[in-house]
Each structure stands twice: as C-alpha cells, then as structure tokens.
Amino acid sequence: MTWLPEWRVTVGDDVYTTVTSVSFASGRLDIDRQATAGYCQVEIINTDGSAFTINVTEPITLELKNSSGTYVTVFGGEVSDFNIGVRSPEESGYITTGKILGIGSLAKLTKVVYNTALAEGLDGAQISAILGNALNLTWAEVTPTVTWATYPADVTWANAESYIGTIDSGFYTMINLAASATAKSQTLADQIATSALGQIYEEKDGDVSYDDADHRSNYLATNGFTNLDGSYATPSSIQSTTQTARIRNSLIYRYGASYGSTYSTSDSDSIASYGLFERSFDSNIKNLADITDIASRELNLRKNPRGSLGAITFRLDNPDIPSAMLDSLIGVFFGQPVLINNLPSNLLGGSFDGFVENIALRATPSFVEITLYISATDFSLSTTQWETVTPASLIWTGVNGTLTWTNASGALT
C-alpha cells in the first residue's frame, strides 16, 4: 500500500498539521535501568506570517495517521524549548518555521525532592506516593496562560493537572525509608522499582505509569505476542549481540532495614567456564524469601552468555509493508510483547520474542523509520501470584501434569 505520514501536533489549544519533520524517543536502552524522560523534536511551517502562540511548559501531543486514516497518539509531553526561524523569503513575504523541543513527564521527577518518610509496604504503594507528590500539580504550578475554560468538560479539579497513569499495586514488600531533605524523587522511585523488578515509564499520552513485577507475565498470558515480520526490517539494523558484560555468576545483595542484611549466591560451573563476574546491589526488598527468589532468578538468567537482538528498524513508508503491520508499528508501546519472525536462520534461530523497551522515530514528509529496542522475554517474566491475576482470563488447564505453581511462569493459558 502507499502510505505517507500525516501528522497532527497539538500544543495547548492549537493544532498544527503543516509538519516538515518529527523525531521522538521514549523508554530505555538498558533493562538494568529504569526509563528516562522521552523527548520529541518537531518542525512546523508558517506560510501566512501569523503569530506563533506556542509557550514553553504547554502540553504537546503528537499524533500520526494509521493505514485507515485514524490519528494515533505516539508521544505526549510538554514544550521545553521553542525556536522561530526563517526558511526562505517569498514574493508574498517570509516563510517561517517553528521548532519545538518537547520533554516527557519523567523529567519532572528530577526536579522534585521527596522529603516524606515512606512506610513499609508494597512497591506500588511507595511508587504511588512519590509520583503523586511530583506529578500532581498545584494551581500555582500550572502554565500562567492556562484557564479553566480550556479543559475538557469531563475533567475535574482532582485530575486536571495530573501526569499519573496506571500504577500497579505492587508485588514485593519494601523496607520503610526515613524522610530525607535531599532525596530526589527520580532516584528514590528508580531504586524502589528496580529492587522490585518493576518498570516506571511514560505512556504514549505523556502520563507516567508503573508496572509491577508480574505485570508483563499477566499481559502476555492474556494477550499474547504481536507478530512483526522481520523481512520488512532494514537489513543493516538487524544484529545479534553476545556480551561478557551481561554475565553475572556471583551476586551479593544488601537488603532489609538500612540495607543491613546480606544475601549472596553464585554458580560454580559458570565461574569455572567464564571466570568470575560478580555484582553487588542495594535492594529495598524487606524479606529474605523474596530476595532469595530475586537472586535465583537473576543468576539463572545471567550465568551463561546469550545472544540478544537489541534494536531493529522498520521503514513505515515501505510500500510493501502490510497495513496490519504498519498499524502495529504505529501503535507500539513500552512493555508490549512482540515476536519478530523471518530473521536469518543463523541469527537467533530465525526469530526473537521479547518486550519493547524503547521506541525511536524519525520522519520527514516522505520518510518514516521506527526503531524498537527489544529485551528477551524471560528477562521480564516473574513468578505469578494468583491474587494478582484475573481468574476469568487465566485458567489452570492445558499445562503439563507435573508442573507446579512455583514454576508456572509464562505457562498459563
């Protein structure tokens, strides 16, 4: 099919469709770290000399039409920088351009200190407290030009200036933390999320959400993988990488109150084969049983070197790409399970399944490419707790008769 990008950029109350270039990125490039603030760069054309009414700190939303002509939101944030330039003089006057730099809501966490004590509780509850403090704005923090008349009719005072999406309840019990006058919200939230095997990230509309440890397992069991045909990928973007830097065969965890307890584990066979690759961690996990499970999982995943796909790039303007796949790529989101098939047979066995960790896009009026960074599936699967899943959609049938609940990660149907 023939498809060319049609953009709709909304800044505050203003809508722009004369877009000449777009780029954005959101997510993380390292599964050992939490996502960082996304960004977008947009250039729009002004041919009539009218005044630009774009202000810094105003919300910005990028939408892209899919194959059926429906606009799909692909990025949300707020304006950080705005620049007006001249493209070329015309007989009727100058043609000017507006260049917008937008940043994601996670950037707000770097600017806010969380100076309140955190009680012992599930990771989701602690994350909710930190995000609520940083991302629920007061009226004094709202862009000065904004009035109540600009809000949709269904918006209430309680949620008018909230940048919080969905926060899972949590999977692990975390230690309590004393109040600190210097605790950065981002550092604190990242430490809790990483300790609990969760992910903090930006939704496509700009809100910040938190997925706890079994979120991806449950989503995969309910929805399965989205299939993407690797034969439509840019060939030079496809590569498998195996690194010694990813090996971990000796682990030391400092956990519990004030990180005063220590748990260690190692794999002698891996050490004999590859040498010692030791890592130590400060974990906010409270209980020994939990830290034991986390350490065992990490050791099993990392004790042997393994190939990984990493990033893969697709041209959305490829006339041969099927409409369904085009729409899947436009709608792709952080944490989505995908299966890349039709890869070379001598590269990862010809297919790779995993979860989307980062999305980056570059576009001109005639060119669009999207690059996905994908982590292997088993790095995101965890031991499922029955109380955190939906019994109506997950049933204990169709599995091997010898399978126990303890080992049922990813096996439910």
Question: What residues fall within each predicted segment?
Answer:
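Acidic, small/polar-enriched beta strand-loop surface segments
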Residues: M1-Y16, A119-G121, A125, T187-D353, ...
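Surface-exposed cap/loop segments at beta↔alpha junctions
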Residues: T2-R8, G12-Y16, A25, D30-Q41, ...
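A structural signal for short, hydrophobic beta-strand segments that form beta-sheets
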Residues: V19, V79-D81, A233-S236, V356
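Short amphipathic alpha-helical segments
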Residues: G38-C40, T173, G310
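Terminal peptide-recognition signature
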Residues: V42, I192, V356
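Glycine-centered loop/turn motifs
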Residues: N55-P59, A181-T182, F333-N341
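Charged- and aromatic-enriched interaction segments used to assemble
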Residues: S68-Y71, S88-T242
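Short beta-strand-centered aromatic/proline hotspots
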Residues: V74-I84, S351-R362
